[in-house]
Amino acid sequence: THDQTRRQRQMCIRDRNPHILNLSPPLDMSAKWFAGHTAYTMAKYTMSMCVLGMAEEFKDRGVAVNALWPRTAIATAAVQNHLGGDEIMRLSRTPEIMADAAYEILTKDSKEFTGNFCIDDVVLHDAGVKDFTKYASVPFGELMPDFFVPDDTPLPQEIKDS
């Protein structure tokens, strides 16, 4: 995978607005994220540390490197099969929220927006989205928080209300 990553980075450098987007969490060193699953947390945070390193490494070439992470569980097969079946799926948002947030990040100026750890709904709120009910598996239902979201992550009222 190292060779493949290197080739992809080289292709990015030639693009007019090059981006690398990792799906990795913000680096929050709270002990609660390590308790009971240290190896898993280390693996996730390793991807996040790559964002920091590559953002600095490629900044002078105009290649943006950012991370995107969901605030809540996302209704995927992994969530369905490993985290609690239909009950957790009802407490999740649809994958479209991550796709829409990724689009917003990938269309930003790569020379201006790099080295950021983004939360899906914050990205969309900043882009003007005010109604998040379309992303909920059950509109106005309770949502299950995802792992690794720092306690101090902003939560605008429009996001709370939908």
Where in the sequence are the language-model features?
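Short-chain dehydrogenase/reductase
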Residues: 6-7, 51-52, 99-102
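Rossmann-like NAD(H)/NADP(H) cofactor-binding core
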Residues: 19-21, 61-68, 116
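Residue(s) in the substrate-gating loop at a strand-loop-helix junction
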Residues: 25-26
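Active-site-adjacent segment of SDR/Rossmann-fold oxidoreductases
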Residues: 14, 53-63, 109
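Single conserved hydrophobic/aromatic residue that forms the stacking wall/gate
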Residues: 1-15
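C-terminal helical subdomain
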Residues: 67-68, 85-162
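Short beta-loop-alpha junction of Rossmann-like oxidoreductase domains
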Residues: 31-33, 63, 69-83
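Active-site helix of classical SDR
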Residues: 40-43
